[in-house]
């Protein structure tokens, strides 16, 4: 017999304005406001600092929105960006860079302790100096949202508000390379027409060897618009690429962009490929990776999550051979092309599912491993390490992470003695890849005990 259920009505929480004192920052740089009265929830609020007394508006069960700062912290600074209150990009400009770095180091320590990587009562972590970035104008890649306002006949270009689809129109971004927004602003008159803007998804601006504008389009642009873009590209010496649902093509005359390795090798890429946003700090990070791994001409290396070869090519310059393993086929192919174009015959590329990677996929064991996974981490590679015979495990492992929670989980897995993993941490540092934001980049180097 069919049974019919009447859906329960959801109780909408009524927003209240409350006063409270911030006790700490959580791992996402949100202020923690403990419940002052029984029945109230602990709230997590972006934009406030420890010790501050604030007025906030409740949202949902545990969130809140900062309304006013009644008693500011001495650590608070004047925010330099006029869009900071509404833009969803930066979320940490209200505290200086040194304290940003101190907070990020503390987050890593707390997570390492939580996952059992170390016990502060009996040991300490071998922290080295952080790799520090320029605090502003460091981004060489930005992605901008667009919306065509039909009634006003106007194209909005900007960043989205935090936790919102609303677009904040901007003319400049203080953390972006000045040339990026200059290119977009110069191109704006050609985009601000119904025939173009109504077909526009988003815009990506990149600057490595030369500026690149990637236009995401939902349908083909008319011939006169294409001609205008072609002329603009020539005059402004900026390459334009068009991306549709199933295709990515440069305009005629647009060259393939490239990044440059620490050895001067060219790393060609397509717009849309993964590229570290902070070019200056990326160079220092790769150099530190070489210093920590110490590859030699007698050694074989696995580079997992290799991308377009950011670590693979410098490793190949120093090691006997490198196997670059990447989950995205197109980028694995790009690594192969980059090795070939730079005259390297000791670098091979493999496209494989890194969640299910096995020793038989890789061939001969490697002396050194390099890992640079996305936020979900490298559980599949950790499982591979556990399954290897002790004599087939690498001498050193370098792990670069943009997510400290999955980093802590994976490092704990690599140190698991019950799995026969006899490693110790010999290097650890934060990498200032994303100043003015709560995002954390970390490098860890493990060495197998003799």
Curated annotation (Swiss-Prot):
Disulfide bonds: none annotated. It is an enzyme of class 2 (transferase). Its EC number is 2.1.1.190. PROSITE patterns: SAM_MT_RNA_M5U (PS51687), TRMA_1 (PS01230), TRMA_2 (PS01231). Keywords: 4Fe-4S, Iron, Iron-sulfur, Metal-binding, Methyltransferase, rRNA processing, S-adenosyl-L-methionine, Transferase. S-adenosyl-L-methionine binds at residues 276, 305, 310, 326, 353, 372. One of its GO terms (molecular function) is RNA binding. One of its GO terms (biological process) is rRNA base methylation. SUPFAM superfamilies: S-adenosyl-L-methionine-dependent methyltransferases. CDD domains: AdoMet_MTases (cd02440). Gene3D superfamilies: 2.40.50.1070, Nucleic acid-binding proteins, Vaccinia Virus protein VP39. [4Fe-4S] cluster binds at residues 81, 87, 90, 173. It catalyses: uridine(1939) in 23S rRNA + S-adenosyl-L-methionine = 5-methyluridine(1939) in 23S rRNA + S-adenosyl-L-homocysteine + H(+). Catalyzes the formation of 5-methyl-uridine at position 1939 (m5U1939) in 23S rRNA. This is 23S rRNA (uracil(1939)-C(5))-methyltransferase RlmD. It comes from Idiomarina loihiensis (strain ATCC BAA-735 / DSM 15497 / L2-TR).
């Amino acid at each position: 017999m069919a049974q019919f259920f009447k859906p329960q009505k959801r109780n909408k929480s009524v927003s209240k304005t409350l006063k409270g004192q911030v006790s700490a920052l959580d791992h996402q740089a949100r202020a923690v406001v403990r419940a002052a009265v029984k029945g109230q929830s602990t709230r997590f609020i972006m934009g406030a600092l420890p010790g501050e007394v604030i007025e906030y508006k409740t949202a949902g069960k545990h969130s809140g929105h900062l309304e006013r700062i009644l008693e500011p912290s001495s650590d608070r600074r004047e925010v330099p960006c006029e869009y900071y209150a509404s833009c969803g990009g930066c979320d940490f400009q209200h505290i200086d860079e040194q304290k940003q770095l101190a907070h990020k180091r503390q987050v890593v320590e707390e997570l390492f302790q939580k996952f059992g990587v170390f016990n502060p009562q009996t040991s300490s972590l071998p922290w080295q100096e952080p790799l520090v970035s320029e605090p502003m104008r460091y981004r060489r890649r930005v992605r901008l949202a667009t919306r065509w306002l039909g009634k006003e006949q106007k194209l909005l270009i900007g960043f989205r508000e935090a936790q919102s689809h609303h677009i904040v129109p901007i003319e400049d971004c203080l953390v972006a390379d000045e040339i990026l927004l200059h290119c977009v602003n110069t191109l704006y008159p050609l985009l601000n027409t119904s025939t173009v803007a109504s077909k526009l998804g988003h815009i990506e601006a990149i600057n490595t060897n030369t500026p690149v504008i990637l236009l995401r389009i939902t349908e083909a642009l008319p011939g006169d618009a294409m001609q205008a873009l072609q002329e603009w590209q020539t005059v402004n010496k900026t390459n334009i690429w068009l991306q549709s649902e199933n295709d990515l093509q440069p305009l005629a005359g647009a060259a393939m962009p490239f990044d440059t390795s620490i050895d001067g090798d060219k790393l060609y890429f397509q717009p849309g490929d993964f590229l570290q946003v902070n070019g200056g700090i990326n160079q220092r990070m790769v150099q530190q990776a070489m210093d920590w791994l110490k590859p030699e001409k007698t050694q074989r290396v696995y580079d997992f999550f290799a991308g377009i070869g950011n670590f693979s090519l410098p490793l190949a310059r120093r090691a006997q051979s490198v196997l670059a393993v990447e989950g995205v086929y197109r980028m694995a192919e790009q690594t192969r092309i980059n090795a070939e174009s730079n005259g390297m015959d000791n670098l091979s590329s493999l496209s494989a599912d890194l969640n299910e990677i096995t020793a038989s996929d890789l061939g001969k064991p490697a002396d050194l491993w390099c890992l640079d996974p996305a936020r979900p981490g490298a559980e599949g590679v950790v499982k591979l390490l556990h399954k290897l015979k002790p004599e087939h495990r690498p001498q050193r492992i370098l792990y670069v992470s943009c997510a400290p929670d999955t980093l802590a989980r994976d490092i704990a897995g690599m140190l698991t003695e019950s799995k026969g993993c006899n490693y110790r941490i010999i290097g650890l540092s934060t990498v200032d890849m994303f100043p003015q934001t709560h995002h954390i980049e970390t490098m860890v180097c493990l060495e197998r005990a003799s």
